[in-house]
Amino acid sequence: AIALGQRKVGGRSSMIDVMLIVIRPLQWVNDIAGRIGRALSVFAIAVMVIVILTQVFFRYVLNNALPWPDEAARFMMLWLTGLMAPVAMRQGGMVAITSVLESFPRPLFKLVSLLLLVISLTVLIVGVQLGWKHVNSGWLFSSSSLKIPMSIVGLKSFKIKLAWMYMSLFTGICLMILVNVELILRSLITSLGGGQRLRQVPGISGDSLESEA
């Protein structure tokens, strides 16, 4: 019986070691993507605020609304959402109804949480396929008002393809798939008793980690 128990512990430890090898490069990729996403999102918010204030000034002060600010703000909002959704998902910042789950016994809570992550991964895989089709269709159409002002350097200006807007959805879903896989691995490692060997997710406090263990 002791030997059997030791084999079980050894097998569990080996599984944890394998999953840790897989999760480490994934954590590194998600860390880098998160930092870049946050920086670009701050830039997008700044541009969006400037564009909206410019439109307000022209529309209500000069009584001569510009044709492009509304679409430019929408462009920035789409990319802001696509870049920050993976960050929010990784840090547990997505809107969720947890009161029912928290009433479950701890083992059942972990099992249901893992099941929900697997379902989410399935939905995201379908979403990335639909998103890619949407991006491809976007190359056929151009924005009604957004242009690259190449006339500044003496070249012909051209309208931005809608695919660049739709790409925000595709990019966001791809990044969320990476985050989802990391969360599944973290859940499995924690369930097997290796939670203390996991590196803390940037942006999550130690108290939050203790509540998940």
Predicted segments with their positions:
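Alpha-helical transmembrane segments and membrane-interface helix-loop junctions
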Residues: 2-213
